[in-house]
Amino acid sequence: MSYSDQRELAPHMALVPMVVEQTSRGERSYDIFSRLLKERIIFLTGQVEDHMANLIVAQMLFLEAENPEKDIHLYINSPGGVITAGMSIYDTMQFIKPDVSTICMGQACSMGSFLLAAGAQGKRFCLPNSRVMIHQPLGGFQGQATDIEIHAKEILSIKARMNTLMAKHSGQPIEVIERDTERDRFMSAQDAVEYGLVDAVLTQRA
């Protein structure tokens, strides 16, 4: 295994911290993410793909079943990913009864920024040095000309749908969203507030 291969594997081999709590039945160990889930905190980190999306959807449904009145906090640090996987998270956020508060730490790009903006109104936040990026959907397809035409129509349909939803959540006119997503548009935390993607920049807990 080369050094570069080891570096690529390193994040996946990292140990997840464990938390030990004292209960009436003795000690109980949790991995850190399971312990934070008890506090209704979910992490959306890395590429948005089907497996990760299924886990996040399952966590949101579990927290809704546990308490349908209490907010869920979704922390986002993602470069984006697969549209259909992201839309499964989006639809669940809109479907469940609890408000989903979104917090960007690090970056929320592409599908990450879409999910950031999709949080409950008044409960969408960026940390001070986070970055947000919006753009149009990416796609590529090889095959017969007719199949390429079919896929081109599909991605244009998805683009129009996502622009409509982004306009709804940001309050920007659809024409502005169409123009600004034509190419990568990067924003600071304060820029994201002014654009309507989030409601405030959090510097410290109240």
Swiss-Prot record:
Ordered alphabetically, the record's keywords are: Cytoplasm, Hydrolase, Protease, Serine protease
Q: Key word Protease present in the record? A: yes
Q: Name one GO cellular component term.
A: endopeptidase Clp complex
Instruction: Quote the EC number.
Output: 3.4.21.92
Which reaction is recorded as catalysed by this protein?
Hydrolysis of proteins to small peptides in the presence of ATP and magnesium. alpha-casein is the usual test substrate. In the absence of ATP, only oligopeptides shorter than five residues are hydrolyzed (such as succinyl-Leu-Tyr-|-NHMec, and Leu-Tyr-Leu-|-Tyr-Trp, in which cleavage of the -Tyr-|-Leu- and -Tyr-|-Trp bonds also occurs)
Give the similarity note: Belongs to the peptidase S14 family.
The active site lies at 110, 135
Subunit-structure text = Fourteen ClpP subunits assemble into 2 heptameric rings which stack back to back to give a disk-like structure with a central cavity, resembling the structure of eukaryotic proteasomes.
Which NCBIfam families would you find in this protein's record?
clpP (TIGR00493), PRK00277.1 (NF001368), PRK12553.1 (NF009205)
Set out the biological process GO terms recorded for this chain's protein: protein quality control for misfolded or incompletely synthesized proteins
Q: Species name for this entry?
A: Edwardsiella ictaluri (strain 93-146)
What GO terms are given for molecular function? Answer: ATP-dependent peptidase activity; ATPase binding; serine-type endopeptidase activity
List the protein's name: ATP-dependent Clp protease proteolytic subunit
What biological function has been recorded for the protein in this entry?
Cleaves peptides in various proteins in a process that requires ATP hydrolysis. Has a chymotrypsin-like activity. Plays a major role in the degradation of misfolded proteins.
Subcellular compartments: Cytoplasm
